[in-house]
Amino acid sequence: MRRVALVVLLLFASVCILASCRESPDAYDMMRDFARDYGISGVIYSPDVPEGEDGYTTPELISRIYLTGEVIPSDYAVILNCRADYGAECGVFVCDSEAERAAAIEMCEERLRILSRGDGTSLLIRSGKTVFYSTLTDHERAEDLWRKIVASHT
């Protein structure tokens, strides 16, 4: 009986440890889920896309889009010119350090400034390791959906 209890206790402890050691959220997976649930289509640009396929990108290309030579987070996913929302754009950066997070926030703020021309048609959400920006038309829906996506991936 003691052996059974010990085995059950060890299994329970193992499950608890594994659950607490989850990996960081993946930008590509989060953006894919967001696009699907929001109903937008377009190419997701990410370093997770194999070279030669639609969506393959490099830090050099991202630095040109976001007009930065600063630190660029290594995990990101961006949809440019969403087909279902009048050419809107959205992106997520998953940051491993405060320097990456600060750079991602600055990059997104500058991108939103350029895209929206200060007309209030933009959304920037900083949540833990993730920085998300959007120019999608329905800000409230995008924000609610993004928060659900973040919760399901962390």
Q: Where would I find each of the regions flagged by the language model?
A:
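Sec-dependent bacterial lipoprotein signal peptides
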Residues: 1-19
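Soluble, non-membrane globular domain cores that form compact, hydrophobic packing
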Residues: 13, 21-154
